[in-house]
Amino acid sequence: MIQPRSILEVADNSGAKRVQCIRVLGGSNRKYASLGDVIIVSVKEALPDSNIKKGSVAKAVIVRLRRSVRRNDGSYIRFDQNAVVLVNNQLEPIGTRIFGPVARELRWKEFTKIVSLAPEVI
């Protein structure tokens, strides 16, 4: 469950390293986001020579979540960190590589480009 002011790691090579959630998209009063949801983030740490600068605002898709998420078959999935992939306004990833595993829920939510770039889908 990601809410505004949550700090997240960035799982791609866009240049940002750490971001902070500033808004959960999908409703006027939505409080929490889960796997595969789109949020608006502010970049808190970035590499010095990247296109993404510290303080810039971007959209991101949640790919890993520390909170246990129940799947339709009754199993639960949980990761060691909260991580996002930065996307543009067309919801395509900004980076060209994705680091670490991503959840299978992204395929169900039509983020096939992120799933195809990921080294492992759990």
Curated annotation (Swiss-Prot):
GO terms for biological process: translation. GO terms for molecular function: large ribosomal subunit rRNA binding; structural constituent of ribosome. NCBIfam families: rplN_bact. InterPro entries: Ribosomal_uL14, Ribosomal_uL14_bac-type, Ribosomal_uL14_CS, Ribosomal_uL14_sf. It comes from Thermodesulfovibrio yellowstonii (strain ATCC 51303 / DSM 11347 / YP87). Gene3D superfamilies: Ribosomal protein L14 (2.40.150.20). Part of the 50S ribosomal subunit. Forms a cluster with proteins L3 and L19. In the 70S ribosome, L14 and L19 interact and together make contacts with the 16S rRNA in bridges B5 and B8. GO terms for cellular component: cytosolic large ribosomal subunit. CDD domains: Ribosomal_uL14. PROSITE patterns: RIBOSOMAL_L14. Disulfide bonds: none annotated. Keywords: Ribonucleoprotein, Ribosomal protein, RNA-binding, rRNA-binding. Belongs to the universal ribosomal protein uL14 family. It comes from the Bacteria. This is Large ribosomal subunit protein uL14. Binds to 23S rRNA. Forms part of two intersubunit bridges in the 70S ribosome. The keyword RNA-binding applies.
